[in-house]
Amino acid sequence: MYSIPDSLKSDIGAFAKHVHDFRNGEIEAVKFKAIRVPMGIYEQRKNGTFMVRVRCAAGMITPTQLKEVALLARREGTEPIHITTRQELQLHNVQLEQAPGILEQLYHLGLSSRGGGGNTVRNIMASEDAGISPVEVFDVTPYTLALTNTLIAEPDSWSLPRKYKIALAGNDSDNANATFSDLGLIATIRSGEKGFKVFIGGGLGSKPTAGFKLSDFIPATDLLYVGEAVKILFSEHGNRRNRHKARIRYIFYKLGEERVFELFHEIFNRLKAEGNYELVLPEVSQALNKGQLIDFNPENELPGKWLKRYAKAQKQTGFYSVEVPFNQGMAKAETLIKLAEFLAPLGEDVIRFTMRQNILLRNIPGQLLNSLYQELKDLGVEVDLPRILNSLVSCAGADTCRLGICLARGASSAIKDSLSGISEDQLDELSDIRVNLSGCPNSCGQHNLSNLGFYGKASRNDRLYPAYYVVAGGRTGDNKARLASKFGEISAHDLPQFTAQLLGKWSVKKERFSDFNEYLDREGQTDIEELIANYESIPSFETDKNYYFDWGAQDIFSLAGKGAGECSAGMFDMIDFDRDAILDIQKGIEHSSDQELINKSLYGIVFHASRMLLVTRGIEPSNREEVFTSFIQSFILEGHVRQEFEPVVKLALENSEASFIEFRALIDELGKTVIGLYNNMDDSLQFKTTPDIPKVIGIVAGAAPDKRFKDFRGVACPMNFVKTKIELASMKSGELLEILLDDGAPIKNVPGSVRNEGHHILEEKQNENFWSVLIRKQ
């Protein structure tokens, strides 16, 4: 398992205080969201209801941990437990006051939700059969854990331009989606040395693409340097200005493959020269007992069919892996508790979560398979169904997600029912087909990588109705990665029948093709287009109301309840809140003659304009006085905003009820100026303006450089590093900065992060319960 960072306990304590302050009205909702989401806590579609995402590196969890998480979910009333397409667990229907306690309990289990959301290093995925596959190059599990341990312990992993997704695969077939990750690593061996093929910049959201191949081989011992170098590259060159263009792939779109790789190698070589990242592989304990080979064909009856559908022989003789299906990844707590109790005697490495939202058991002795079958059957697991019926993937969709357009889970259930009309023999022929659904274009259901996929949209006839785009032909793997192609759209109502008809055609033609993708390339595209054409006509609401209800919905389809997603919650949410407030206030008083309202509104413009961009300087004001004084210090005196605005800001500081009407034109101009400054801010949060202050004289050759001083005691990670980084950004090469840091996580994390930026740590000196760190800017 991965190691919990030293800072997590204090992070949870700080989060509990933030929850208290938010509930008491001391923190605005937009600022609290920026705190909450990086802790892995998302608001669901129903206001005031939340989801907690639990990190499970490589999809690993021990039987003890699984049982305790299930008991926790049962105690807290957060069932069912959701297995995600990124090999994690999610606890749904959490009330905000429950969240700190849940995080504390997860901490004591050796589990963390930190980085489950926001602009952070997300859960690192790995091949579900890592360590047991007869065809893997080598086991990538310990490498996944080592990379996780390093990255989640560093404060700059929580303040990236956007999410950073990593995956490791055991061979070129890439069953971990490494070729479509921000950083993808595929195991390989060269001249007897273990290593990885490296891909950078893959992704499935907006403007999806396969990763750009950096190298056919980097030594496995360089793994941490690669992970760190990509993170620093992302942090320095990622677009912090526009969240819709903030993933690593957009750096490639902007700078080109050659330049991005040059930047990577510059950072990588610098890190290697410093030599701070020694690879230490955690031991993964398999604790195998003696296994026994079994016959997979004891006639053709259950559990023989179950074995053929769900069990595979491992490379360890006498041991087997078994896929345990959970419909749409939803599991009852009682089921997981009993399953964990059954598995506990078999050791700690017996469970992996899969990207098809199921559990893959491993290291199961052959002699226990019949007992396992009976246990699963007693628990109500659908062990007797053909595999394709238990491997349909869907995201949460509009059931709980704020971005969801369609009820993807309902559509998935309807497809399952429709496919059930096909004979079992035909369904068994479809066992390897990947059918994936997403409730919107964001690809949380991984439709872009499916053999046959769908993603939700709102279409209109005489009124709105739920529909899906049809995509097909996605594949992963070195030299063959390909996104699914879009063919057209179909109503949600017709989707199940369409799916059954298409897969029925494939099952009849299957013997003529090597796989489904060859069928698509030669005949399948025509079949899809013809079937879509058959369903083009949508009856009016009066003729057939069923088309205007989504699967599982009680109400007529609409976009009510759809809202902004929270994945990128952070700095720009707070900025946008103040910007929108300025614009709304200006519009609200444009034609008003109410002098009292106008005066109060003008003060509001000064307040929001003063606060709007403070976060870009690492400033988090706790009261109105700090808002105004910080704005004067960091924007007016620094020359980013004209000095003529200073008197009106000071007036607001001194008296919120003063007369502002006589300064109306100036205040309107202040609002426009700050918004204009924001609009001209570059990707790295620097302002494209000439500061209205005298230039600082550079360092004279041979002269002792000036030393700046900043006291960051009491400032928690990662804000202490953010403040240090901002201070260094305003300095010249060779200048010195002395900072004071608290003992514990700050001194452990900040100096290392500063080194990663290329600066030099000249001295670290302890003074009782704090440290002095002297930095020379590169």
Positions of predicted regions on the chain:
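Long, contiguous binding/interaction regions
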Residues: 766
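Short, hydrophobic, well-ordered secondary-structure elements
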Residues: 595-614
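Peripheral terminal and linker regions in Fe-S/redox and tRNA-modifying enzymes
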Residues: 1-588
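Core SAM-dependent methyltransferase catalytic element
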Residues: 772-778
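Amphipathic alpha-helical interaction surfaces in cytosolic regulatory modules
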Residues: 719-725, 729, 743-759
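An N-terminal amphipathic alpha-helical segment
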Residues: 697-731
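Long, charged low-complexity segments
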Residues: 570-588, 610-696
